[in-house]
């Protein structure tokens, strides 16, 4: 049976829409920070958090005890918290005799354990009786109520196996997940495993089907996969068949698909990203998408259901399950209690025996006794919780006087309040931070400089740049700027001796320009030796047998790596560098190739391929070929002449042999006109036109307000990290560069900005760069705090005399930054900076970067809290504790607001992703984060699992956001502050739909500080509210809405 095309397309559309709540997961080597609830950003923040709890079984707010700890530490605005409670109470019915505001504020601040969900069996009359010390009123619970409770765990779309696990303890879900994970590991492996799934080029579903049909282990278990796969040879057809066999109504297919995909949302997110990443090498070789993945999951799930039905008599479809529950609700209820972990401990043994006996009469006798006991316990516990709360609020007597109807209203009200309390705490903590930051911004016009600075330094907006910028500025004549770390130049980079492109830009952008790295000098012998040794190392380290075969293969060198990088990383690194010297000096190819140059390159490549083909196919060595023979073969393969007569005659090839060889040149070696056109098109992507070069330099300078007063040195500082034995290393690199180092983008812009032709064009546009200004690329290692200059051999001779001063200043800032930062990493502050030894702290930072045993080489972007867009003068006098993204911006250089819109649409969106990833990883590290690094194992060279088999861990590890099991990262939504006239900033925000929606839906906080009016404007409750700039923290209640 083959499904009709229209039906197949409908199923594909359903699957892709069902997968939209699942965030993309990029390979670990280019880790991209992302919002775990990115697919729900169209919803208000609170609604998305609630849906995330249902889909991913994860919490979206910190527990109350942690919030109370923040309150005790003075990190919560108590006034705002009380106002949140008052607003909630204004919409609630009154409860006679109770001061609800005081009661609920006491619940928040003085009761550590939440009251939890209301009782399921005990009602208000039962609780009232306990409060009065009376016996519970006699009451029989109807079977319909029990069936309803069971039905609440069986919503439409929930997979049948999940219901069976709950009612019968089958653990089908865990078994299914294990089989699916193993299948994914086999198919998606990128060279880690010794064995890869055969036939992967056919795609995930076809390759897996071929293996599954022959899988003896599955057949012996009774999983007759082959019978299911025989129904249809397409994944869409199999999906339709399985859903029909399960009896799932078509209206519920979407919810069912979403439940299936979110079960292992890490794997689903990786497949979802991979299927759309057309440039990704492994996607092109071995295609896969969510339809393939879902079909495999449904096939295995149906096979497991049938296996359990045959062996244990469990229902095999939804209709059978419904009949089972309806025919014996008592058994269904007790099964749910026992297998769902709700059973009363004192009656657990009796319930287990009754379920195992499978005799309706026995469960019917046990049920009334169980229900009565549970009703009594629920009533007593709830009464005790209410009494404890009321007494702490000074309302114990008032609680005793409540009638049953009042108790019912109070219970429902408390449940609604606890559902919303996370939002209230978050708003109060965010108000506290906003109240600390906004009034401290300096809006005074800056004094004109007496002289130009010694150096101007552009850093990435990354929060880790804030510390080193501050220390560099304190040293003296340095002016710093913040700009997105790709410097506004999206490039696709082909590094030295690399064969693939790396996108160095935010993932929301797609680069169209390719940059090549070329070596200046090279020693052929050294290159051959080093590349061979490096290949040996790569193969050995990649092998699962490496701990055993390395000593036999190349002595103790690899073993020394393990010990040296753990016990003496600095000394060992210096010794190791003598074996692995730095790569040769390089230049970047930035100018467009002419058509003649491109065609010449293609001709050279074709000639080289022809020589290779002749040697491989015909066994003819190069020295026997003349240039004319090679030309003949090339022209024949391209169809420019009929045959290569001279070549055929020289080597005595008959007509068939000659024709066959020429066809091989076309088909195997791709020497044909069509492929030549494709190569010409690809070569056309290399470099930038002069107009593009002028545009990128001008845009970068205008976006940060640097259009005049250029100093002798302008440093473009990209950043990245270095750490050993760290799968999350790319998470510490530059997010604006796609999880890569930013030095290449810095070199690109510096090389362009130093061109005379580019400067001449910029001068026509009003940007006059001084004749003695030189742009120098630099690299900020965020793990060691080192600042390193690049391409110094290009410096004009006139600048050489100043380089020592420049390097010394950068080194001093690095040491001071390390002294500050290392205190946050050590258990005791004195460990990092004993006796003010900043050099010692710097050495410790370098040691951490080289230590294989170091699980936290740096904190990364933890504790990020705000994104400030404005002049450095507004924040220059503040110690922002490495918590703020700083993007330089001068509205006076941007009369139409286009530059501000670009900052909002690009860098701010990336910052919001970073912020949300840290937020959710800190709030619930077990589900949104990735747990402890200690238990991580690499999966297929592209991801991380916990233990040997798990879902792909998609968030940040505990060591990045937690310290001593408590959040080190304070989870706050990103506070975005724009320093500009309010109308100017508001127009820009409204002009960027993505940011406007994030603001309206509460995914970030937005504020504008107007330097002309000295007012602050904060977007709250769907509108802008005006505050005096220097009194934001005191103006919570005195709000003026701006229409």
Curated annotation (Swiss-Prot):
GO cellular component, one term: plasma membrane
Main subcellular location of this protein, as a coarse class: membrane
InterPro entries, A to Z: DabA
Cofactor field: Zn(2+)
Keyword Disulfide bond: no
Superkingdom, natural source: Bacteria
Coiled coil regions in record: none
Subcellular location: Cell inner membrane
Positions with a binding annotation for Zn(2+): 460, 462, 719, 734
Protein's UniProt keywords contain Cell membrane: yes
Protein topology in the membrane: Peripheral membrane protein
Keywords: Cell inner membrane, Cell membrane, Membrane, Metal-binding, Transport, Zinc
A GO molecular-function descriptor: zinc ion binding
Subunit structure and binding partners: Forms a complex with DabB.
HAMAP family xrefs: DabA
Function description: Part of an energy-coupled inorganic carbon pump.
Family per similarity comment: Belongs to the inorganic carbon transporter (TC 9.A.2) DabA family.
Protein name listed in UniProt: Probable inorganic carbon transporter subunit DabA
Protein species of origin: Thiobacillus denitrificans (strain ATCC 25259 / T1)
Gene: dabA
